Amino acid sequence: MFKDITLGQYYQTDSLLHRLDPRVKIVGTLVYIISLFVVDTFAGYFVCLLFLAAMICLSNVPVGYIVRGMRAILILLLITMSFNLFLTPGEVLVRIGFLKITREGLIFSLKMAIRLSLLVIGSSLMTLTTTPNQLTDAIESLLNPLKRFRVPVHEIAMMMSIALRFIPILMEETDKIMKAQIARGADFESKNLIKKMKSLVPLLVPLFISAFRRANDLAMAMEARCYRGGVGRTKMKPLIYEGRDQAAYMLLVAYFAICVLLRFLRLPFLI
């Protein structure tokens, strides 16, 4: 399950989305996430889905590779849907004992599931098409105005980039530890939820030790290369906006405008 997480991984290939300025991709991801909370109808989510599908086509990343990240949040998705399905008041459609499924709960749970799925896939697409160095430079460039207030922009950008890239590494490490403990007789497949949670507790100690060891190795490697923060550092590949980046910004503005219109344009056939 852990190896299915695509957030934080980079998929190397040549595509239009890979060649875009990383600042455009970060801003685009933020705009896309905001748009998911702006729209509140199935028509709006369909527009978000079309936009995401177009970006996936432009990325040349296999759809199966992107969608497999959904397996990791399947339990969270089911829990979210269940809470909204049974706890939302409204017109009762089905009653099962003390539980009741309402029309409003059914619609709201479907919307939440769609929103969460699109959010995870959209966020993963940014890291799949952006290298760690590009991500760090882009975050630093976007936060650059904060330097006037003595905010350590470079260090913040570096920490965010490292944290994001450590997600798949830690998930892979967790998978290895689980396999090692299964070989020693540990049971992670129990259907009893309490037993399953207890079996995950022994994972924490080796996982924390591994995380600290990797962090120490990274710190030593950075010191060996004389890393002293962002003071006096120059860029080997400075970020420069090109024509395609400006066109991408215009596309983002048009997309967000459509989402806002769908939110405030109350048509009777939009649910």
Residue positions per predicted region:
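Loop-to-transmembrane-helix entry motif
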Residues: 69-73, 77, 113, 117, ...
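Alpha-helical transmembrane segments and their helix-start/interface "positive-inside/aromatic belt" motifs
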Residues: 25, 64-74, 248
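Juxtamembrane/interface alpha-helical elements of multi-pass membrane proteins
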Residues: 73-186
